[in-house]
Amino acid sequence: MCIRDRLWEPWEVQKGDGTPYKVFTPFYRRGCLAAAPPRAPLPAPQIGLATPPSATSVDDLNLLPAEDWGEMLAPHWQIGEAGAEARLQAFLDGGIAGYKEGRNIPAKPHVSRLSPHLHWGEISVNRVWHAARDHNDLPAEDVDNFCSELGWREFSHSLLYFNPELKRRNLQTKFDGFDWREDDGLLRAWQRGMTGVPFVDAAMRELWQTGYMHNRMRMVTGSFLVKNLRLHWHHGEAWFWDCLVDADHANNSASWQWIAGCGADAAPYFRVFNPVTQGEKFDKDGAYTRRFCPELADLPDKYLFAPWTAPKAVLDGAGVRLGETYPRPVVDLKQSREDALAAFARLREGAV
């Protein structure tokens, strides 16, 4: 693991009065970019590892579950330092050009997928930052946008440093009285990618099958959980922690508080991502959704993100039987949005 896995330490980026930033833009622009530049990456150490003494093998202790989940995830990753370097070079050679716009489209290769390597210390964030900054052939706006995403990582770590209970407590304490629902059936449907809302289900299946989820999809699925289903963000944080290969206390907790509206610089609670229009905008040809929801592959694009609106003849032609081959929606998107906004209004008015 990297001893220091941040570009700036939290205590190095504070406001003039010595208090921590609570909003990302001034944190990054006035704090990070105005501070001393991140140090250059250090060369890899030359360490001779001693041969360990013989001992009982881990397998003999029967500590691991019988089902090897890692076996399913492994084909999607080149694990280790060499894999991290290869991933970085592939991103610099192809993915980062067009990053500003392409990073929101899950079927395109415009995200770095370096977060697992950063989390496990297989590459340093300094190496990634300087590799992007020093690559003279890259569009400046794409590099700046990518580096600002590394800045969000710094912001999350700063929030955790100054708020060590970030994983457990709302940063905005008014949300302590929010009217969350408890429904194990809805939670299981969300976890399994069986909500009947294809763009959400595709993302949840990507998570289960690969240990990863595109950032746009993390926002869409998070919004669906805490707003349409109105289940506590703790449930989402715990599931992502269990399933993501890049699971990180700071990023995971801060991101869930952001989407729930109870965190620092949070998305307002009344901003509810519509998974139908999100799919139509960011997965126009349906490549991502069809990859992870193959039972819907033959649906026309017009109905792919809302199959419950398709005429029976269209469903029959695509081999889709709602409630059998693919679930009906677990909630009505319009009504559940209105219910969420009503719950927030009660909180704001102190009527909860």
Q: Each predicted region: which residue ranges?
A:
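Active-site-proximal binding-pocket segments
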Residues: 109-301
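Glycine/tryptophan-enriched, flexible segments
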Residues: 18-174, 282-283, 287-352
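Conserved small/polar residues in nucleotide/adenosyl-binding loops
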Residues: 1-5
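Short, solvent-exposed loop/turn segments at secondary-structure junctions
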Residues: 6-7, 29, 226
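Glycine-rich, charge-decorated loop segments at or immediately adjacent to ligand/cofactor-binding or catalytic sites
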Residues: 6-17
